[in-house]
């Protein structure tokens, strides 16, 4: 158990579905936030938490 995190080591945060995850500070489960990308963009939504659907995404450019 990481002292900085409420989740078990290697597990996922309880706030994994939200971009307001400020309580979790352990690198093992902290994920960055990004807008959800349109269908067909394979580069996005990998290792990040989607904060909402979007027709445009910087990582799909």
Curated annotation (Swiss-Prot):
The source's superkingdom equals Eukaryota
N-acetylmethionine modification sites? 1
Tell me which Gene Ontology terms the entry assigns under biological process. Answer: cellular response to cadmium ion; cellular response to copper ion; cellular response to zinc ion; detoxification of copper ion; intracellular zinc ion homeostasis; negative regulation of growth
Family matches, as InterPro entries: Metalthion_dom_sf (IPR017854), Metalthion_dom_sf_vert (IPR023587), Metalthion_vert (IPR000006), Metalthion_vert_metal_BS (IPR018064)
Ligand binding (a divalent metal cation 4):
33-34, 44, 48
Residue numbers binding a divalent metal cation 5? 34, 36-37, 50
State its role: Metallothioneins have a high content of cysteine residues that bind various heavy metals; these proteins are transcriptionally regulated by both heavy metals and glucocorticoids.
Tell me which GO cellular component terms the UniProt record holds: cytoplasm; nucleus
Q: What is this protein called?
A: Metallothionein-1
Gene Ontology molecular-function annotations: metal ion binding; zinc ion binding
Q: Does the keyword Secreted apply?
A: no
């Amino acid at each position: 158990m990481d002292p900085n995190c409420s989740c078990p080591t290697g597990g996922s945060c309880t706030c994994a579905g939200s971009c307001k995850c400020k309580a979790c500070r352990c690198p093992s489960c902290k994920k960055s936030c990004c807008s959800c990308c349109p269908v067909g963009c394979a580069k996005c939504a990998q290792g990040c938490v989607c904060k909402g659907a979007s027709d445009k995404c910087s990582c799909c450019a």
